[in-house]
Amino acid sequence: MKISANSIRTGNILVYNNDLWVVSKTPEHTQPGKGGAYVQVEMKNLKTGTKRNERFSSSDYLEKAELEQKDYQFLYFEGDDLVLMDTKHFEQINVPKEILEEKLPFLTENMIVKVEFYNEKPLNIELPPTVILEINETDPVIKGATATASYKPAILENGIKVKVPQYLEVGEKIVVKTDDMTYVERAK
């Protein structure tokens, strides 16, 4: 499917120079005083892992990879692979851990994830937008901290460090965004 350079978004997988590239950073749209508008795109090759910056004219069209998306349940780790089970047909597949990169700590047992396939090969795993995690370490509560909008560092059960409001304590569960690893709210 062809898309305009202006329509490129973070996470899009493009077919460029006969390779698959994932857009790794929000594209910058620039309108210089002289010359035509262009879009600066940072992307990563899915095969080699190399990063590249490309400049496309706003009038350019690029090929967006047609991906098939299926729901899978995470079962367990097996060496350097994740073992996932299709939620409809109960078939199990092994997917390399490196597909998730820095989001791997958010993966919990029995979590439902979306696996994106290109030509029947798993390319990407999409986690739920938020997860509930427990605070393992943080500074003690300071009296009167509910009135301030300041944050303190906290280490969660999965080892991730996030900034949380001053009033939260060790043992409390919080909601965290998986895309940028930020605090959302106290879990209900």
Curated annotation (Swiss-Prot):
The molecular function GO annotations come to:
translation elongation factor activity
The organism sits in which domain of life?
A: Bacteria
Q: Would you tell me the Gene Ontology cellular component terms?
A: cytoplasm
Biological process annotations from GO? peptide biosynthetic process
Question: Which CDD domains does the record cross-reference, listed alphabetically?
Answer: S1_EF-P_repeat_1 (cd04470)
Query: Where is it located?
Result: Cytoplasm
Query: Which PANTHER family does this UniProt record tie to the protein?
Result: ELONGATION FACTOR P, TRANSLATION ELONGATION FACTOR KOW-LIKE DOMAIN-CONTAINING PROTEIN
> What is the protein's given name?
Elongation factor P
Protein species of origin: Rickettsia felis (strain ATCC VR-1525 / URRWXCal2) (Rickettsia azadi)
Upper classification of the organism: Bacteria, Pseudomonadati, Pseudomonadota, Alphaproteobacteria, Rickettsiales
